[in-house]
Amino acid sequence: MSFLVAIVGRANVGKSTLFNVLTNSRDALVFDFEGVTRDRQYGQAKYDDLGYLVVDTGGISDQDAGFDEFMAKQSQMAIDEANLVFFVVDGRSGLTSGDEYVANLLRQKDKRVVVVVNKVDGVEEESAMAEFYELGFDKVFAVSAAHRRNTQKLLDKFLKKPLNEFYRDYTQTQEHKEQQRHGIHFSLIGRPNVGKSTLTNRMLGEDRVVVFDMPGTTIDSVSIPFERHGHKYTIVDTAGVRRRGKVKQTLEKFSVIKTLQAIQDSNVVVAVVDAREGISDQDLSLIHFAIKNGRALVLAINKWDGMTEEDRNLVKQDLKRKLFFLEDYVDVHFISALHGTNVGHVFESIDTAYACANKKITTADATRLMQLAVEAHSPPMVGKFRIKLKYAHVGGHNPPVIVIHGNQVNRLPNSYKRYLENFFREALDFRGTPIVFEFKQSENPFADRKNKRIKDEGSKSKKTK
């Protein structure tokens, strides 16, 4: 599981601006599933190297019907899921009935809430904050998200402690220990109704997950340990148990949060795609999130049975066009979860991807491969600078991290970095896992001696004078 920060508040108070500050990016994950609130944003953030998820829940209003009511339900689910809630208000506009409506929702939850008084640039902070204490929360803090004023202080004061406590407690939980014991931990991700639960049942060989043919009815994710051919696994079906009723009110959006958390907790991610619908932007968002988190990856193109040869060729062309960045290393399987076709091959790829992600490489081997790559294709000259790669070593596993030391490595072009990745991948036969390269500038061992000599010469010249 991941620590979750929910940003809530009425419309136009600066929630998205605060979201961008926390995630340090405008590349939010935006999902548009059927039955899902539009333009919801999910992002990753870090504080002192501790990762957490951020969700911008959209504006809550006190309207009783229609889209606003649905938005309010979405935001209430965000509150339920969150470890910390940033309740954003507008310091210029002052306290409104909309703020009071949101505060009333929050008071019904036993959550850690910080009232973030935004847009205080040009306004005296204490006076801007004063009236918001009327909302009944003891933690009130003023920021200007647009100018990043006090935003770091906000995190230092209110995020640091609960985030550190979360990570400390999580590593001690039984859930974490069970996850470590049950072999390869993999998750099935994908849009609603692509067949994740059917594939779960096929993999387990029994109907452990109740499935109805209704998109948008996700309630929770299900984690199940099992064994197959003597190998231990834990499977997470992010679709989980489905129910018939309340399709419009069911908050499928928050299966997205569970999906993102499942990706982060997994050793291997199986992305399930409906062959008849093809690859969507949502599929690409989930796949990119998995790669960004360094997860090993397998693709399962489901509902392949019953398609004409012409349609199959069109699907393959579409996959090649949209997933060109994966074709060198990710296994793609065309399956029928319902009939079991090729599901066994998915297991083979899961095993291979996991083994590659955790492959042991010595410093000698890493350096030797780097030298072979340089001999075959030297780093380019960058202006008057000659880039020299000296040695390499492994910096981590799952994903594999290769650390390369050298001179002028900060000038190494991306094209050469891609060349190194492809060279290492082919030489080590890495399938299914991304490889992370880190480049570190080698320190000049004579720099201190040179600086000392210059300092000494300076001292002598002063004495001479």
UniProtKB/Swiss-Prot annotation:
* Pfam families in the record: KH_dom-like, MMR_HSR1
Q: Which UniProt keywords apply?
A: GTP-binding, Nucleotide-binding, Repeat, Ribosome biogenesis
Where does the chain bind GTP 1?
A: 9-16, 56-60, 118-121
According to the lineage, what is the superkingdom?
Answer: Bacteria
Protein residues bound to GTP 2:
190-197, 237-241, 302-305
Keyword GTP-binding on this protein?
Answer: yes
Q: Which residues form the KH-like domain?
A: 359-443
Q: Identify the Gene3D superfamilies for this entry.
A: 3.30.300.20, P-loop containing nucleotide triphosphate hydrolases
- Gene Ontology MF terms: GTP binding; ribosome binding
An example GO biological process term is:
ribosome biogenesis
Outline what the protein does. GTPase that plays an essential role in the late steps of ribosome biogenesis.
NCBIfam families noted in UniProt: GTPase_EngA, small_GTP
**Name used for this protein in its record:** GTPase Der
Q: Which organism is it from?
A: Francisella philomiragia subsp. philomiragia (strain ATCC 25017 / CCUG 19701 / FSC 153 / O#319-036)
Q: Which gene encodes it?
A: der
